[in-house]
Amino acid sequence: LNQTALTRRSPAWGRLAAYLQKRQFWLYRNTDAAYFGEGESFFRDLVEHLRQAETYIFMEYYILAEGTVWDEIFAVLKERAAAGVEIHLIIDDFGTLTRLSDGTLQAIKDAGIEVEIFNPVHRYINRLYFNYRDHRKITVIDGYVAYAGGINIGDEYANRIERFGYWKDSTVRLTGDGAWGFAVQFMQMWKMLGRHFP
């Protein structure tokens, strides 16, 4: 991406591009973005795109909660896994501690989905590392579609149940080359957790 051309269009964009490039982040072109200002529309769009996955799906969430939202997503993931799509899931142990049963976790694994639990909670954990959490909320589909934002997987994020009042949060979908940056982030975390790709 040409930083000079960006600077001509907007000095602020040029400064941001320079900042990112200096820190060795990749900049992408050929990318469209769609904004979702609430959970229900995001989940509808996510399920639609998950159905189209052909090669792989990466999902990384702080909270994955049992409920109707997860049931809809899991039904599609099971179908795609049975069709040969590789599915890798990272969930934060503390975020899902009371929201995901051992039975559901086993069902996910039994469906052929590779799962990694980030920073498992146990009684001997050092207080310093207890707060070391994975708050990412991303999904990557075939390296071409990526979602990132503030919405976890749970019914309250779609306002199907009320836990803390009406839930207002957002997510963006990137379609195109820019989705690859999220795929790289996920793969780096997967490898950091001691896992490998076939």
Kindly give the residue locations of the regions a language model identified.
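N-terminal localization/anchoring segments of enzymes in phospholipid and broader phosphate metabolism
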Residues: 1-198
